[in-house]
């Protein structure tokens, strides 16, 4: 098999999507157990409070991270592929030095801004001290992100999988007992313990491959300029993402209550996180390979289209199954107190189909280092997201939020694909459009039937649709892989 086939073949994409999808599935399964226990112990209000703290951590981490998580992977991946070992070690030392700088910056900024964050997040009580105590989490997150970028760029895929599994196991065994004993008072301490355990696990692996070295001199700043220039553009995109996340949760807390925040967070977790298991291989495997393609338009289009096909075919049966079983799955995953979010989740599942179309194409600008393009696309998405979120909530409560997510995905994909065609000569294959039409038809059928009937006939039709989606995906993927091996 030549290099082109290796990097863009269905077998390679399916292999690593399955590996990381399987690992992420295990991680999510353990996370489900943890979330179930936390939901029972804290309820929607406690889950809402935790969501606000987590969105604050993400916002400050993205603001002070300087986009190093993305620019470092791109830089190190190139050196690793070209086997420039000495330069690679030097760059790793540079990235670690800047991880320390961003960790300190995040710590200080969190402490300084805590009164302001408290003012805009809560209309009641004083949580300034709680926000200050998030500072160590932000510092540890920055240090962990630097080490993870090194492992991603140098293709330590198995180790990354192990880090994910051990991290979520530590979160389970440390946080649940604290919530059981102390209730909501344990939220911030448990978040600190989770961040610390994740950091220890990560450095245990990364230090094994590349011993820890840092330096702080004039070269630390001069050598990092190209990487920082690229990273700062990604920084803006990251701030918009975590900022919009923070805005919508704060908006829900002000306009509604912490219960609304908890319900929304549960719905978001089920759709965007649990159903996003298939996308876990994107950043770890797909992005480095796409970065190595360079300016070869034909190979890039082949790789992106195949990633689109595999992602859609793998995720569609899972989404249709989730849609059908939501009335049963939602109380099992959380509790009966979260059933009010069912209408939102059901319609928001269609946003995941949009997500499967969006991610592989969005990574083109990222892989090319077109920071301005990436920034503008991200800004467009989050402006659409906040607008549709506000309109949806004001007009149809939680169901409106779910519908807003779908409309956001649809409008953004139209913009994204038109731009990708104009800028990068990317064109989606007719075969991919056919697959999408079939899977969307089956999903629409299940949505309509499950929303309007609860008879034996309706359940039979839903089961038939799930089986049809699964068999169709299996047939296409099997034939695609067989065709590659026949051509060898």
Predicted features along the sequence, with ranges:
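Interhelical loop/hinge segments that connect adjacent transmembrane helices in multipass membrane
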Residues: 1-13, 202-245, 285-302, 423-437, ...
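Alpha-helical transmembrane segments of multi-pass membrane transport and lipid-handling proteins
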Residues: 93-122, 172-173, 180, 278, ...
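Hydrophobic alpha-helical transmembrane segments
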Residues: 128, 132, 161-209, 226-230, ...
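Helix-loop junctions and terminal segments of transmembrane helices
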Residues: 66-82, 153, 210-211, 267, ...
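Membrane-interface junctions at transmembrane-helix termini in multi-pass inner-membrane proteins
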Residues: 139-163, 185, 349-381, 420
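Transmembrane helical elements of multi-pass membrane transporters/channels
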Residues: 16-32, 47, 167, 191-198, ...
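Membrane-proximal transmembrane or re-entrant/amphipathic helices at the cytosolic face
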Residues: 2-5, 447-488
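Membrane-water interface segments that mark the loop-to-transmembrane alpha-helix transition
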Residues: 15-27, 53, 62-115, 129-130, ...
